């Protein structure tokens, strides 16, 4: 009993818990409940005690019980009083030893050795290694703190805590051990388990509910759908809307921007809600194994910004990415190299060396503080899909505003179509119908088409020009791809002129037909048309413009003369740049003309063969007039593209015979060059010999020759 009396703390409490229903303990509890009221009567009871001794055998059981209670009262009263003091309030923590368990219900508890100088809340025995006031536990919501008051210190989870050290924040569970002893106390916090679980989830809903946004699906589809084309011919879903078109383009952009911002806010809210729910519930990582729509830099920003101290090691970044995005768990390890490259090359990521005091190895990575807010804001912004970009050509309002047609859309120009379908950017009017029904089918064999307009100041600015752009030229096969017979009928001559255009595969040809008659087929009139008042019996004249190949697709100037016959047609053929070694195109004009009367002789105008040079039209023939107003006009027109022209004048012997004809000879393809001969016969004089310049091989010379006939200048021949 002396042992119980000495240790009136923990052992008495242990006895109470071991037998809570014992009558001895009930009596002790009753005695402790009335300590002040029962203390005066005991001194008055001893005098009548001795007379009552003989009467003890009768009521024997009751006095024995009371005697037992009186002998054990000094040890148990203190424990019962301590339990009564601790009863109010919930338990904050639990302290467990080998033979006791103590519930901490007060904000401050003292642990030490019990002595006569002062009491402690939890006595650990009479060991001299334990101070009278050794430890002090204090609770400051929501953490517990330990302060060491004993001179020997204490071990907390193996870490020594000396006397006078700052208060140590305790974890949820830890173990105290007194030095030089085997006495241990197991500490367990009960505050978090009883009150904390329900609190984090309740304030989550008021924060998320205002961010819920409902966007009607039909309205969104109508906003996102592409604007229909005015002509209804071509629809490009991914093309950018043209700003000059439509009055609602600005409002469309505004609504689209607002819609994208709302969707972005909704995505942020949903992602934040999912992350908070996952953290609060302690659930598993997401199960979506698809590749996340974020760049490596965004993944790095997400990982670093989620850290508590805003810095992570390379392994920490890897762990964060694999935890939140399961795709990278099974993916090839090449993404780790990309993460390292982004960290090293991106100027927004700063490498911070680890201090010597910090354990571990490897440097930390941080985000540049100047750009951290902006990068964190864009960390969860999904990347946009790469669409078809729009290119605007700098050729003014008549140029194309959309991308050219690709080879995968062969239906742009079909052989059965009534007209050529053009993009809406060209013109709102229909394109002209091809003159030849087979032209569409022949142009359809070319993989790609481009549309352009002539310069506004040109004579045919209102006429669209079809430019067929074939693939790269092939030197192996020289197969003609265009053969267009046409008929030119003049008002004076019912017979037709056959025009054959033979074009090789790599050649790009642009043909324009311009007529001067008011009721022509196409209705385009030459702007530089001169006076046509004079009437002469002349045949239809064809002008060929085959310019220098180095000019490519540039527009060739048209040589205009003083007068143009009423039914003349101008045919211009412009050749593109050709690869070396690829044969050029050949244009052959066969023009049978009526003989022109000069005195009593008929001078037939023979066929003109041209290959790559300018052909000069024969003007109206009158007496005492040159076919060309001046030889300098021809030289000036051909100075940039052809060799110098040699002009030979042939004068007639007779005084009354007018000029005959003008002829220009150039390089012909397989046939020898044809020349025009002026024959004038007079009595007793021989004919003038024809000028024939041929090489031994049968090919024409490279230097063209022009011969003109003039009026009578007296007898003799001038050269």
Swiss-Prot record:
Keyword Flavoprotein: no
Required for interaction with FOXO4 and MEF2C: region residues: 81-406
Ranges annotated as biased composition (Low complexity): 665-685, 696-712
Lineage top rank: taxon: Eukaryota
DNA-binding region per Swiss-Prot/TrEMBL record: 291-386
Compartments (UniProt record): Nucleus; Cytoplasm
One example of a Gene Ontology biological process annotation: canonical glycolysis
Segments of this protein annotated with the region Interaction with SIN3A and SIN3B: 2-40
Key word Cytoplasm present: yes
The protein's name in its UniProt record: Forkhead box protein K1
Species this chain originates from: Mus musculus
Gene: Foxk1
